[in-house]
């Protein structure tokens, strides 16, 4: 009896297994091909070049004549492009994929033969560069732009990472725009714009290319903050100075007469009771009408041309504004507003240039001397040359 039961169980189990296996065969039958699949040759030696919003993909054309075409997939197979190998006679396939974003893409190449058998995919991940990358590149800025005769001398900040060149365009003497052909290279920061129109703003744009990239990309044009400065004729300006700070005929109006001469300079008081009084303040009225005020970008101070010990200017503070400055103000630091320029001058040279990164606009100027290199408290200014432009006429 036990033997019959055992035999029956074996027969039932065997039948169940046979039925189950038969069901599994039906499930996987569509994925199984008698004799196995034929896989055409896979794409080999797949490489890339990264460009601006694009990549260039390259691989070897299959040597198997049965392989006639391929499909290039990217974006997780959401996008594709057909590749006909007959279009590439030299044995090298080159495909450019553009309109890409700043991110990584995985590209797959699948080959097909005449019977539509497909190869295993050849895969390559590439990261093009685009607008996000370009925005992160820093543009140069203008250090100074000043007329030198009929030309403009432009000084820029140094080149930044991945910068390959900077181009310029400007207005000439006729008011026409000039696209200057000479490029400013990364190793230099000065350029001359021939025949530039003084007082006008100019434009510049730099090109960038990463070390791994093949495309050079130009940033949009940047308009200079200031116009091209020039030496201003200040002969009609009015200059006053702190009361009693004049020696003999050396009056303050002579610092803007265009002459660098001993008989044409301002010298502060030499009187024992007055010479060490500070601050000594020059107050200047340019007389400019509203809307025609200058934006000042540079001043050149002339002191004694030959005797070092007679160059007295030490610290200076300059202000530019729309209201007159009191030359007798004791509390200038709290009443004159924000200083435009300040610093300390050396006695090494007879001239000292004071340059602003951005021009300051106003009718009135104050130059404050809070001290002197001289123990006697002297200030001896032979000439003051102002440079600037009129903002309302700069475009």
Model-found features: residue ranges?
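Beta-strand-rich modules
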Residues: 95-124, 192-225
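C-terminal motif of bacterial Sec signal peptides marking the signal peptidase cleavage site
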Residues: 17-20
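Solvent-exposed loop/turn segments flanking beta-strands in beta-repeat/beta-sandwich domains
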Residues: 55-56, 61-79, 155-180, 310-315
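Trp- and acidic/polar-enriched beta-sheet ligand-binding modules for extracellular glycan
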Residues: 277-278, 307-395
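Disordered, acidic Ser/Thr/Pro-rich linker "stalks" and the adjacent N-terminal cap
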Residues: 222-287, 308-310, 392-395
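Recognizes extended acidic, P/S/T-rich segments that occur
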Residues: 69-103, 114, 169-199, 339-345
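Pro/Thr/Ser/Gly-rich low-complexity, intrinsically disordered linker/stalk tracts
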Residues: 22-65, 120-161, 217-237, 387-392
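A short beta-strand element within beta-rich, extracytoplasmic domains
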Residues: 293-307, 367
């Amino acid at each position: 009896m036990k033997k019959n039961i055992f035999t029956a169980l074996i027969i039932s189990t065997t039948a169940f297994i046979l039925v189950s296996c038969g069901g599994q065969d039906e499930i996987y039958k569509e994925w199984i091909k008698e004799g196995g699949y034929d896989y055409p040759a896979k794409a080999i030696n797949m490489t890339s070049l990264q460009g601006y919003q694009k990549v260039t993909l390259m691989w070897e054309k299959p040597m198997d004549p049965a392989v006639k075409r391929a499909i290039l997939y990217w974006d997780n197979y959401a996008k594709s492009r057909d590749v006909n190998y007959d279009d590439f006679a030299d044995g090298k396939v080159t495909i450019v994929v553009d309109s890409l974003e700043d991110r990584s893409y995985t590209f797959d190449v699948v080959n097909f033969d005449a019977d539509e058998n497909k190869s295993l995919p050849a895969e390559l991940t590439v990261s093009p560069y685009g607008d996000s990358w370009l925005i992160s590149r820093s543009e140069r800025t203008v250090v100074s732009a000043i007329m030198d005769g009929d030309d403009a001398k432009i000084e820029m900040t140094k080149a930044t990472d991945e910068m390959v060149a900077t181009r310029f365009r400007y207005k000439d003497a006729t008011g026409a725009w000039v696209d200057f052909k000479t490029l400013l290279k990364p190793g230099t920061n000065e350029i001359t714009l021939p025949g530039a129109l003084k007082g006008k703003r100019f434009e510049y744009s730099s090109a960038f290319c990463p070390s791994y990239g093949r495309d050079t990309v130009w940033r949009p044009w940047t308009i200079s903050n200031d116009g091209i400065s020039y030496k201003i004729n200040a002969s009609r300006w009015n200059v006053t100075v702190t009361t009693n700070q004049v020696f003999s005929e050396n009056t303050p109006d002579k610092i803007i007469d265009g002459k660098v001469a001993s008989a044409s300079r301002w010298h502060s008081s030499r009187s024992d009771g007055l010479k060490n009084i500070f601050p000594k303040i020059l107050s200047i009225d340019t007389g400019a009408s509203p809307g025609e005020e200058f934006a000042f970008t540079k001043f050149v101070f002339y002191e004694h041309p030959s005797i070092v010990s007679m160059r007295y200017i030490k610290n200076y503070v300059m202000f530019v504004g729309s209201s007159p400055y009191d030359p007798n103000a004791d509390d200038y630091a709290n009443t004159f507003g924000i200083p435009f320029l300040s610093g300390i001058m050396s006695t090494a040279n007879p001239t000292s240039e004071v340059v602003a990164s951005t021009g300051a606009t106003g009718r009135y100027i104050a130059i404050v001397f809070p001290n002197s290199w001289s123990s006697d408290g002297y200030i001896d200014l032979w000439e003051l040359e102002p440079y600037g432009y009129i903002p309302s006429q700069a475009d």
